[in-house]
């Protein structure tokens, strides 16, 4: 018998499968929270995924909800989400049945008031300032007259037109525009790439390297200018090797790139004015400097002329300057004749001293000595030949004796010895003949020198040698006294003579004058 309590009664509660229940919850949640606005702090943000979607969470002090921003929505955001930023997200809540999770799909995102953004900017500013990126010592002066200006901005806005127009009015230079987006997704990356790209240009390349950079954007809200507060952009501006001018927004708009730039311009037009000077002002200044230089040069020339006149008046006259040199010249000219006479006398005395060493008896003795040397050499040569002949005869005798013992073996040696003796004899005769020729040549040369230095050659030219009674040559007129017996030697003989008084000579027949054009036979002693 079955108990009443053991039987199962049907329940009034509907039964669902897990999928049905999850789908019902999903529909209920999406219908109830189809459009919501949620305030919270971004947590776990790591930037967009490789697919372009962004995943993070919104949290407050007691709860947390996952959030997703699809790729198309992320591209339309006015600013990039950042970790710790308080935002207001607008979207719809949905669930994910596979893991029983719910999340908000964000359609728009905005900062939760300007105060939150300013607090984030201040926190980032303190961090970068602590690293020294905003130090005044890092900032470089702008070039006075750049040749190339690089501009990083949007190519379609009014900003680039204002910059180009202002540069053309002030000082036309070469402007290179690097087109970028200045707002929205990817704007920060493009501006950073432009700054780094300009710095990567090499001087002298196909694209000229700018001398100064301008990063410019027009005015806008804090959200519109948010990319210029990006940490990567601030670091790129601080690391730029090219001086950089920031011109973001209006004069009251300040971004972090303004603190890292070398100069901050209140407007893009002001940046163009900072980059290039006014050409007309430079020309006027140059003309003023040229006029001042011309006046200074004229005054300097006048001063120099006055100084030159004063110095000229203080200088002595030309006659005074030349008086002493003229006197020295006259004295030198007067002493020139005396100097020539003294020099001639000195040369004559030197000649007489040297002539004394060329006496005939010395040359004769030298020739005799050379002849004796030649005879000695001839005798030595004859003895040498005689000894060689004797030694050859001895060798022949020895060879003859040996030949008797060994005729067949020594016949060749005898012939060779005989040839060697003959060769030695010929060589000895040739050597003796060569020595005799050389000695005869030297003796002939000495004889020619003796003949040239002999006084007979002088007598041959028409001169006479005067000797006293002892036969000694008379060298000076002072050694001759009246009545002194003299001997006059000519080239063809000698005659006796007596010296007259006071140097007068006995009368001689008048010599017939030489015919005109007939050369005289009288030679010159010198």
From Swiss-Prot:
Query: Which GO biological process annotations does it have?
Result: DNA catabolic process
Q: Name one Pfam family in it.
A: Exonuc_VII_L
Q: Give the protein's function.
A: Bidirectionally degrades single-stranded DNA into large acid-insoluble oligonucleotides, which are then degraded further into small acid-soluble oligonucleotides.
Show the HAMAP family listed in the entry: Exonuc_7_L (MF_00378)
Q: Could you state a single Gene Ontology molecular function term?
A: exodeoxyribonuclease VII activity
Family matches, as PANTHER family: EXODEOXYRIBONUCLEASE 7 LARGE SUBUNIT
What GO cellular component term, any one, is given? cytoplasm
User: Subunit details for this protein?
Assistant: Heterooligomer composed of large and small subunits.
Q: Where in the cell is it found?
A: Cytoplasm
Q: Enzyme class, one word?
A: hydrolase
Is 4Fe-4S one of the keywords UniProt gives this record? no
Predominant location: cytoplasm
**Protein name listed in UniProt:** Exodeoxyribonuclease 7 large subunit
Which reactions fall under this protein's catalytic activity?
Answer: Exonucleolytic cleavage in either 5'- to 3'- or 3'- to 5'-direction to yield nucleoside 5'-phosphates
Transmembrane regions: none
Family to which the UniProt record says this protein belongs: Belongs to the XseA family.
Region ranges (Disordered): 499-526
């Amino acid at each position: 018998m079955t108990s009443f309590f053991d039987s199962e009664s049907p329940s009034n509660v509907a039964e669902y499968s897990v999928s049905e229940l999850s789908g019902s919850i999903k529909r209920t949640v999406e219908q109830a929270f189809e459009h919501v606005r949620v305030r919270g702090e971004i947590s776990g943000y790591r930037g967009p995924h490789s697919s372009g979607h962004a995943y993070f969470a919104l949290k407050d002090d007691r709860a947390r909800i996952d959030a997703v921003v699809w790729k198309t929505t992320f591209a339309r955001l006015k600013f990039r989400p950042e970790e710790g930023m308080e935002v207001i997200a607008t979207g719809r809540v949905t669930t994910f049945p596979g893991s029983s999770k719910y999340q908000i799909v964000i359609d728009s995102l905005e900062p939760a008031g300007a105060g939150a953004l300013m607090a984030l900017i201040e926190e980032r500013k303190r961090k970068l300032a602590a690293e020294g990126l905003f130090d005044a010592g890092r900032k470089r002066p702008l070039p006075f007259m750049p040749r190339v200006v690089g501009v990083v901005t949007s190519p379609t806005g009014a900003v680039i037109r204002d910059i180009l127009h202002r540069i053309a009015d002030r000082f036309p230079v070469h402007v290179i525009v690097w087109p970028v987006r200045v707002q929205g997704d990817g704007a920060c990356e493009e501006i950073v790439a432009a700054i780094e790209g300009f710095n990567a240009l090499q001087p002298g390349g196909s694209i000229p390297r700018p001398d100064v950079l301008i990063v410019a954007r027009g005015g806008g809200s804090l959200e519109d200018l948010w990319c210029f507060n990006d940490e990567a952009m601030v670091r790129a501006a601080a690391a730029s090797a090219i001086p950089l001018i920031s011109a973001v927004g209006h004069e009251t708009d300040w971004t972090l790139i303004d603190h890292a730039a070398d100069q901050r311009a209140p407007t893009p037009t002001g940046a163009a004015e900072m980059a290039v000077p006014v050409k007309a002002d430079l020309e006027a200044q140059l003309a003023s400097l040229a006029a001042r230089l011309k006046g200074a040069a004229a005054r300097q020339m006048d001063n120099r002329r006055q100084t030159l006149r004063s110095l000229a008046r203080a200088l002595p006259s030309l006659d005074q300057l030349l008086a002493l040199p003229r006197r020295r010249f006259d004295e030198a000219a007067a002493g020139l004749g005396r100097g020539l006479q003294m020099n001639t006398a000195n040369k004559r005395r030197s000649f007489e001293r040297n002539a004394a060493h060329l006496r005939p008896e010395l040359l004769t003795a030298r020739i005799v000595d050379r002849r004796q040397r030649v005879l000695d050499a001839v005798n030595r040569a004859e003895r040498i030949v005689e000894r060689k002949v004797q030694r050859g005869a001895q060798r022949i005798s020895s060879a003859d004796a040996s030949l008797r013992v060994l005729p067949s073996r020594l016949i060749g040696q005898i012939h060779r010895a005989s040839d060697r003796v003959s060769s030695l004899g010929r060589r000895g005769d040739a050597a003796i003949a060569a020595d005799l020729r050389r000695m005869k040549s030297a003796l002939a040369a000495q004889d020619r020198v003796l003949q040239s230095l002999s006084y007979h050659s002088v007598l041959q030219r028409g001169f006479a040698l005067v000797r006293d009674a002892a036969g000694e040559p008379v060298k000076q007129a002072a050694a001759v006294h009246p009545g002194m017996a003299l001997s006059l030697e000519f080239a063809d003989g000698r005659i006796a003579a007596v010296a007259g008084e006071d140097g007068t000579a006995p009368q001689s027949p008048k010599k017939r004058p030489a015919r005109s054009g007939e050369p005289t036979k009288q030679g010159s002693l010198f």
